[in-house]
Amino acid sequence: MKQRLKVKYLNTVIPELKEKFVYNNLNQIPSIKKITINRGLGQSHQNSKSFDYFLDELSVITGQRGIVTYSKKAIASFKLRKKSPVGVSVTLRGEKMYAFLDRLINLALPRVRDFRGLDKKSFDGCGNFSLGLNEQLMFPEIDYDKINSVCGMDISIVINSGNNEESLFLLRELGVPFSELKVS
């Protein structure tokens, strides 16, 4: 079963992209390649129970088991040893990627307090988009009573477009809410 966001991309977004931008080849049409969700452990890297909890929580949110990221060198001021766990990362592709993006757009972002849209300045110049979330409570899969600590995550959407304009158009047509800055 195809995800509804992928069906929308194939049926409506691709023709609109072809109409607005000129492409000589079908492979030049921008598409989302992967979504990477990264979550740092902060002070929790010393406690293995909270570390396992963060790993399970991220797998519930994304539908895929994460991998552990380790420190490359020791930093004494952070009480960090070499090769100690410092974060959890998940890379989503294919159907799970579209399912997560659909849940992010339609369920999680509207639940953010005082949400007025995502900032257009979060593009990196090559068409990739990054956003940071302050808490995990916005996802409906998370049970409020079972949370050890509130912490956020970084989400990077990798798009194979050469510039920010095409990526912004693609994400806007998929339904990602961007803020409209009014110049006064």
Swiss-Prot record:
InterPro entries named in the record: Ribosomal_uL5, Ribosomal_uL5_bac-type, Ribosomal_uL5_C, Ribosomal_uL5_CS, Ribosomal_uL5_dom_sf, Ribosomal_uL5_N
GO MF term list: rRNA binding; structural constituent of ribosome
Signal peptide residue numbers: none
Pfam families linked to this entry: Ribosomal_L5, Ribosomal_L5_C
Keyword Chloroplast: yes
Keywords, comma-separated and alphabetical: Chloroplast, Plastid, Ribonucleoprotein, Ribosomal protein, RNA-binding, rRNA-binding
Primary residence: plastid
One GO location term (cellular component): ribosome
Localization annotation: Plastid, Chloroplast
Record carries keyword Methyltransferase: no
Superkingdom, taxonomy of origin: Eukaryota
Cross-referenced Gene3D superfamilies: 3.30.1440.10
GO biological process: translation
Task of the protein: Binds 5S rRNA, forms part of the central protuberance of the 50S subunit.
Subunit field text: Part of the 50S ribosomal subunit; contacts the 5S rRNA.
NCBIfam families, sorted: PRK00010.1 (NF000585)
Family from the record: Belongs to the universal ribosomal protein uL5 family.
The protein's name: Large ribosomal subunit protein uL5c
Organism of derivation: Bigelowiella natans (Pedinomonas minutissima)
Annotated gene: rpl5
